[in-house]
Amino acid sequence: MLEKLSFLLHKFPLVSKCGFIKKLASESSNDSNIIRIPDFPGGAEGFELVIKFCYDISFEINTENIAMLLCAAEYLEMTEEHSVENLVETIEVYLNEVILKSLSKSVKVLQKSQDLLPIAERVRLVDRCIDSIAYAICQESQSNEDIVDWWADDLAVLKIDMFRRVLVAMIARGFKRYSLGPVLKLYAEKALRGLDIFGKEAKKMEAEQEHEKRLILETIVSLLPRERNSVSVSFLSILLRAAIYLETTVACRLDLEKRMGLQLRQAVIDDLLIPYYSFNGDNTMLDVDTVQRILMNYLEFEVEGNSADFASDIGELMETYLAEIASDRNINFAKFIGFAECIPKQSRMYRAIDIFLKTHPNISEVEKKKVCSLMDCKKLSRDVYAHAAQNDRFQENLSNSDSPAPATAEKTLSPPELSSYKNELSKLNRENQYLKLELLKVKMKFKELEKEKAFEVMSGSDCSSSVSTASVAKPRLPRKSFINSVSQKLGKLINPFGLKQGQTKQPKSRRHSIS
């Protein structure tokens, strides 16, 4: 009897070839014809193949059943001690001559062995398959320096523990560790498929499945080569998103952050847009703390205090990221300031600060001044500084600046010209405010006329003649006076910097944000 199935068999064919059954038969009472076999490897399917062998019924040994057959034969002690050319010897010949000489077949048998543990370990089937795979891959890599993906794709069918053991065996045989990057990437893409690491929705997986994927991810990270640039920063970013999403160990996440910091020069903005995975109701869009730690790793290991290197390498990238988080209405003042202060002041942050002030209009004046103090006006171009001078959100802070003029202007203008430049900026600002006021008056007058006309229409047909007379007598909208006023003001601005005849100047944008 096997599991819940009963097999009606003659004892002699089994006893003559199976030492285990012979022992059970001798120990059972003479009156009992039932032999129970517990925990049989391969189950009923494996036992049926053993029966065929004992009854000399032909069947095929192949990659699908050889692992099950070997474990069953070893369990039943079908060795040469009990019968010549017994099942164990037959399987060993096929295993050595066919299976272990083929990489793909060895991987297939190893995959089947995963469901036959621990007996597959005891008969050394797992170790022999792993050693065969490692040897074949090392031979392949020596003959072809370009790593072939086909064998990496074969390894992706293995469970993470077997996959790890194969890679360790490959390294022990001389495989170059930095070449493991593409293999790990391919395995991660298949094993971690289905994770919603680009969204912020609640997890939709069972606890057991989450634990399995967490174990896979932590193992992959532990196998990553230590050599810089052995894997892309984009792949590291995906692993980090998954690590945060699956709530892996802190050590795993910090390792990935450190690796990204070392390769931050190759990063693009999408690599840093890591969602803030919060399942407690926090609506912040991006994980600023994680990116800040990545930046600190970069500053510690790469820049070492040289701010010029920072500006040339990733200054623009960090300014772009700062602008991204500035547009988040849910990001608080302290977090924005904390990240911005990590960026050296020579990096121009006008756009990010402008977006933050526009998105957070209710912050206090003290906080507003603190935000504006992050910007070094000396590093602004003339056009940007002129734009900031006309921006309502910056005017007061620029006027109080110790050095309001941009550094480029100081280098190209003499002191009298610089003073004239500042006066022109102030004059332009006042005139801009005056034009806004004039436009507001016209809009108010226009609204009054619309209200009067609507009232006249509602008066009915009896008042039509009087309305017509009144409308004829009513003075028209003084558009001409407004146009003349605007023309006069614009006329004053034609040559604000004392340009010579024939010189031209680019028109200045009057918008309050720079795209």
Curated annotation (Swiss-Prot):
One of its GO terms (biological process) is protein ubiquitination. Residues 418-452 form a coiled coil. Keywords: Coiled coil, Phosphoprotein, Ubl conjugation pathway. The keyword Coiled coil applies. Pathway: Protein modification; protein ubiquitination. Belongs to the NPH3 family. The BTB/POZ domain mediates the interaction with some component of ubiquitin ligase complexes. This is Putative BTB/POZ domain-containing protein At3g49970. It comes from Arabidopsis thaliana (Mouse-ear cress).
